[in-house]
Curated annotation (Swiss-Prot):
Recorded name of the encoding gene: prcB
Keywords: Autocatalytic cleavage, Cytoplasm, Hydrolase, Protease, Proteasome, Threonine protease, Zymogen
Temperature dependence (free text): Optimum temperature is 55 degrees Celsius.
InterPro entries: Ntn_hydrolases_N, Pept_T1A_subB, Proteasome_sua/b, Proteasome_suB-type, PSB_actinobac
Entry function: Component of the proteasome core, a large protease complex with broad specificity involved in protein degradation. The S.coelicolor proteasome is able to cleave oligopeptides after hydrophobic residues, but not after basic or acidic residues, thus displaying chymotrypsin-like activity but not trypsin-like activity.
A Pfam family it matches: Proteasome
EC number(s) on file: 3.4.25.1
GO MF term set: threonine-type endopeptidase activity
Lineage of origin: Bacteria, Bacillati, Actinomycetota, Actinomycetes, Kitasatosporales
Protein's recorded name: Proteasome subunit beta
Family per record: Belongs to the peptidase T1B family.
Activity control: The formation of the proteasomal ATPase ARC-20S proteasome complex, likely via the docking of the C-termini of ARC into the intersubunit pockets in the alpha-rings, may trigger opening of the gate for substrate entry. Interconversion between the open-gate and close-gate conformations leads to a dynamic regulation of the 20S proteasome proteolysis activity. Peptidolytic activity is completely inhibited by lactacystin, and to a lesser extent, by N-acetyl-Leu-Leu-norleucinal (Ac-LLnL) and benzoyloxycarbonyl-Leu-Leu-Leu-vinylsulfone (Z-LLL-VS) in vitro.
Amino acid sequence: MEANTRSTGRLPAAFLTPGSSSFMDFLGEHQPEMLPGNRQLPPVQGVIEAPHGTTIVAVTFPGGVVLAGDRRATMGNMIAQRDIEKVFPADEYSAVGIAGTAGLAVEMVKLFQLELEHFEKVEGAQLSLEGKANRLSTMIRSNLGMAMQGLAVVPLFAGYDVDRGRGRIFSYDVTGGRSEERHFATTGSGSVFARGAMKKLFRDDLTEEQATTLVVQALYDAADDDSATGGPDVARRIYPIITVITEDGFRRLGEDEAAELAGSVLQARLEQPDGPRAALL
């Protein structure tokens, strides 16, 4: 049958048989060995050294949500990559920022993108934002075996909810547990420092421009205290990846926009190295 379909150019029957709208279910039925959760690693001694993505931040504003990430990947105490991309569109109205084991995280994002695309093609409509968040939770849970060996993936998921007319943020733990964050969220090695900055600077009435400035300030503070987080690198023209999701869909700021935004933050830091100060009362 396989040889016949190859010679005729026809798709195998499995591709033409009605079934689940989940691409993961399809793989699980026909090619289960391709699912990340079905891989078995040999027993290892100690920690597996692999590049890790670090800090991701997200913040809502009245018109949508901003998701951003630094560009550094580390392997132990070494900088493995200076310009890694950690923020990806999931579909037209959502995005994923990755922290944890970089290779597995990027693979999970690609599978997630396929999952959403497959559902839309089969059902003729997009999943709700909550449904997308639940699908990602299932994928993270399937990686638990890898996480137990030190290869964890802990992303942030953000998107514009077209039904509710606002931006939403979902955070996860290593077991796939999902929580919706009210205003802002962080993940990765510099998350505690970034969260502290966002907690002091967040306001309910942020404009889109202020929200993008806030995430750069938060990433700068994270890089200031966490060696695994990379700040803006003017010499190499490496700047944070900043994405905005509104009712118009997903948009990534261009390099010139990111450079201008990072430049304004760096210029202000010459006067106030510790960043903007929040009012005491």
